[in-house]
């Protein structure tokens, strides 16, 4: 038995200079796992609660000492002596101790850090890589694939201080034969984009996730510049590389309308879906995330109706990695893909349940980072372990983003042909 003998919580820093929670789970025999919780900037209103101290005299109220105290007290007391390999049992104990719908007593950040640290400790106890242990927990032992990366190379919205309303413009190297090749293609496009921006006298500073954040006149301008960068890097848009957008539309949804203040345009729900569809007709955009507000279910139904057969429509704020909300979407034919962020729901077990539900319904799965990250690379193992097919973990700079890519390189090296890179087949509507 992988008996838990100690649990330690601490406050550490994330990639935006804000505190976050880290946990260690120690087992008999000297085995240990350590994990940190990430934090989002554009968050869905129904996400599990990230517990912050609210003490304005310390980190502007963003301290996490209460969450750390919960780890070192209530959570430690509840899990001492338990078996770290019994992930579902551990997570359920923490959920029961919390006793709230959205984990606002203990904090999803506290529960998640311990949940992931326990999984890492259990993998160490079993003497297997983390991805192998997660695949066991998922009921898919030995079934792996390498994810197609969604690389956020140009930022707007909440992730940058510029005139672009759409939050993320991403490239997906679908023509690559391996993850290693996909990463190289993305890096070359990233550097090509930097030179294109410089040549136009535009800013080459980067946003929270490592993408460039130039002040462009419109969202279409962003797509046009990326097209130039892709071609300058020697690749062909539509075959070697497809594009993906994260609109984060909830951030510019006001009074039932979509206000693109950067462009001086206001759209109705259906009007904004028509606008996005027109972009997909001008550029090879294969995926659109959060193309409407999280509460605009009628709008989502229309968007799915007009684009769902050809474009991957990803629900992030829409579904918040929550099986109850995802089930409603599946039952009503809303979207066709889910973004998975384990801090939205707050435990590994619940995350795996959302992935399984999505896949069983024929939805694609995109494993995602948050804008506030750490060096913790657990999402890389999660993507491979569940054969998710796609991963979204930022640009090709900032070590908090690159840590995940580097872990994927290591995993691909270990697994070889046991973890194929399936390219375009992974993206809904594109196979």
From Swiss-Prot:
GO terms for cellular component: cell surface; extracellular region; phosphopyruvate hydratase complex. It is an enzyme of class 4 (lyase). Pathway: Carbohydrate degradation; glycolysis; pyruvate from D-glyceraldehyde 3-phosphate: step 4/5. (2R)-2-phosphoglycerate binds at residues 167, 341, 370-371, 392. The active site is at residues 209, 341. PANTHER family: ENOLASE. Catalyzes the reversible conversion of 2-phosphoglycerate (2-PG) into phosphoenolpyruvate (PEP). It is essential for the degradation of carbohydrates via glycolysis. This is Enolase. It comes from Shewanella pealeana (strain ATCC 700345 / ANG-SQ1).
């Amino acid at each position: 038995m992988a008996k838990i003998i100690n649990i330690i919580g601490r406050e550490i820093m994330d990639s935006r200079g804000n505190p976050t929670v880290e946990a260690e789970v120690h087992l008999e025999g000297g085995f240990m796992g350590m994990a940190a919780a990430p934090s989002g900037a554009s968050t869905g209103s129904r996400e599990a609660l990230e517990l912050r101290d609210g003490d304005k005299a310390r980190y502007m109220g963003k301290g996490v000492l209460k969450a750390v105290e919960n780890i070192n007290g209530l959570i430690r007391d509840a899990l001492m002596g338990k078996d770290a390999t019994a992930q579902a049992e551990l997570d359920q104990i923490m959920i029961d101790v919390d006793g709230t719908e959205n984990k606002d007593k203990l904090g999803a950040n506290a529960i998640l850090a311990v949940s992931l640290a326990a999984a890492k400790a259990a993998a160490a106890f079993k003497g297997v890589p983390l991805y192998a242990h997660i695949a066991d927990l998922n009921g898919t032992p030995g079934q792996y694939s390498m994810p197609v990366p969604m690389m956020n190379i140009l930022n707007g919205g909440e992730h940058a201080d510029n005139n672009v309303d759409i939050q993320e413009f991403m490239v997906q190297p679908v023509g690559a034969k391996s993850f290693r090749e996909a990463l190289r293609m993305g890096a070359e496009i990233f550097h090509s984009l930097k030179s294109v921006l410089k040549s136009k006298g535009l800013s080459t500073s980067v946003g929270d996730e490592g993408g460039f954040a130039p002040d462009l006149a419109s969202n279409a301008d962003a797509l046009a510049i990326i097209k130039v960068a892709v071609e300058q890097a020697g690749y062909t848009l539509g075959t070697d590389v497809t594009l993906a957008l994260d609109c984060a539309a909830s951030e510019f949804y006001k009074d039932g309308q979509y206000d693109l203040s950067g462009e001086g345009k206001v759209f109705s729900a259906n009007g904004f879906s028509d606008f996005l569809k027109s972009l997909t007709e001008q550029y090879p955009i294969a995926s659109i995330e959060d193309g409407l507000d999280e509460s605009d279910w009628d709008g989502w139904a229309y968007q799915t109706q007009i684009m769902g057969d050809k474009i991957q429509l990803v629900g992030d704020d829409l579904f918040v990695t929550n099986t109850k909300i995802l089930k409603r979407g599946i039952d009503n034919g809303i979207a066709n893909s889910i973004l998975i962020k384990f801090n939205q729901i707050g435990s590994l077990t619940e995350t795996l349940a959302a992935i399984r539900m999505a896949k069983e319904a024929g939805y694609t799965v995109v494993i995602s980072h948050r804008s506030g990250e750490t060096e913790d690379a657990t999402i890389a193992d999660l993507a491979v372990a569940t054969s998710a097919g796609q991963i979204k973990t930022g640009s090709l700079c900032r070590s908090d983003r690159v840590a995940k890519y580097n872990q994927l390189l290591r995993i691909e090296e270990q697994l070889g042909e046991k973890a194929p890179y399936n390219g375009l087949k992974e993206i809904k509507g594109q196979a």
